[in-house]
Regions:
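Metal-ion/cofactor- or nucleotide/acyl-coenzyme-handling active-site neighborhoods
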Residues: 1-192
Length: 192
């Protein structure tokens, strides 16, 4: 189903600010939060997290959120989390419920938004780099969860560079500080 609204995808990069999120929340857009985005955004339309370990750690805080939830790893039948399927690393999937992974949740969220029918995707918090020693806007994940080292970000960028974005889909990177240069960049204030 094609969506007429734009969707803002909120990742966890260290340049993400509460002010940017509050600005987005006032716009007529849908919002797809990745992982801990629920902690900074109170108006999620969707929540996506790949890893079962993340869901286990956060379940008591996210289980009652009114947004639609998606995961890539098996969720052991958790009610309210739709299970997506891993369809490989590179490219994009156009078959529901399969996702190409790009080996990171940000890439998977883009594929999910396209599968959901969105034609205008706005990226926020897609730093794809460390910033002043930080990996995420909230600091590090707990030790039992993943915190990507810098070399991993560099490897992930290659998947984005070769992402075959359909001609009728527009992806704009509104991230304040980013190493992701394959999509046009614009500040939020120029988009709304």
């Amino acid at each position: 189903m094609e969506r007429t609204k734009a969707i803002v995808i909120i990742a966890g990069g260290p340049s993400l600010t509460k002010e940017d999120v509050e600005y987005v929340e006032k716009q007529d857009v849908d919002i797809l939060g990745i992982n801990d985005a629920y902690r900074i955004c109170s108006r999620l339309t969707y929540l996506y997290a790949c890893d079962r370990r993340w869901w286990n750690w956060h379940w008591t805080r996210v289980s009652e959120l009114p947004c639609k939830k998606f995961a890539l790893e098996d969720m052991d039948g958790r009610i309210g989390v739709e299970q997506m399927e891993n369809d490989g690393f590179d490219g994009l999937s156009f078959e529901w419920p399969k996702l190409r992974t790009g080996k990171n949740s940000g890439y998977q969220a883009i594929n999910l938004a396209i599968l959901l029918g969105y034609k205008k995707l706005i990226l926020l918090g897609y730093d794809m780099q460390h910033n002043n020693g930080k990996v995420h806007w909230f600091g590090d994940h707990p030790k039992t969860l993943n915190n990507a080292p810098l070399k991993v970000f560099k490897a992930w960028l290659g998947f984005y560079d070769t992402m075959p974005v359909p001609e009728d889909v527009e992806i704009i990177n509104a991230t304040r500080e980013t190493a992701l240069t394959c999509f046009p960049r614009k500040p939020l204030e120029e988009l709304f």
